[in-house]
């Protein structure tokens, strides 16, 4: 096994053991699955900090009065047809309404997204993103960026509050 992977696993395990415990009453299995899925599809090609940052945005939205108050409702927010299918390009998180399958087939990326979700739920926040509520890929320029305060860029994602 690759030494870097073993060291990363040991580091993450140590962080989880010594971090504050996540209340099972606060986040049920479905909520954790929604967070892992969003991190996987929105940022699996990003560095680990970038994946945690995406998770930070999701939890910050859950805590904000401007957004739904559960992880799944935040991740699945958007416009839907009457039959319940999300309208393409009208979702808060693009993967949810891109018309593609939500099957997580890359085992290593799934494990990394799971590790990121665990750390986010344990309270880890990427420095400078404590109040982040928005992000986008750096290859697009949404109209809403004019109304937001830039916080920082991590990998190919740009974060705002």
For each predicted feature, which ranges?
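Sec-dependent N-terminal signal peptides
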Residues: 5-14
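N-terminal secretory signal peptides that target proteins for export/translocation
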Residues: 1-2
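C-terminal segment of classical bacterial N-terminal signal peptides
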Residues: 15-21
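Bacterial extracytoplasmic/cell-wall-associated proteins, especially those involved in peptidoglycan
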Residues: 21-161
């Amino acid at each position: 096994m690759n030494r870097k992977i073993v060291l990363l696993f040991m580091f993450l395990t140590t962080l989880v053991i010594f971090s504050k415990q996540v209340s099972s009453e606060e986040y049920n299995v479905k909520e954790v699955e929604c967070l892992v899925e969003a991190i996987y599809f929105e940022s699996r090609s990003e560095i680990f900090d970038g994946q945690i940052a995406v998770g930070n945005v999701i939890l910050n939205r859950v805590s904000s009065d401007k957004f739904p108050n559960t992880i799944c409702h935040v991740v699945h927010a958007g416009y839907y047809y009457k039959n319940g299918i999300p309208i393409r390009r009208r979702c808060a998180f693009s993967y949810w309404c891109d018309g593609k399958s939500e099957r997580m087939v890359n085992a290593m990326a799934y494990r990394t997204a799971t590790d990121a979700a665990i750390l986010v739920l344990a309270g880890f926040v990427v420095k400078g993103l404590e109040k982040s509520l928005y992000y986008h890929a750096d290859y697009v320029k949404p109209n809403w960026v004019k109304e937001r305060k830039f916080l920082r860029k991590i990998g190919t994602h740009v974060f705002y509050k």
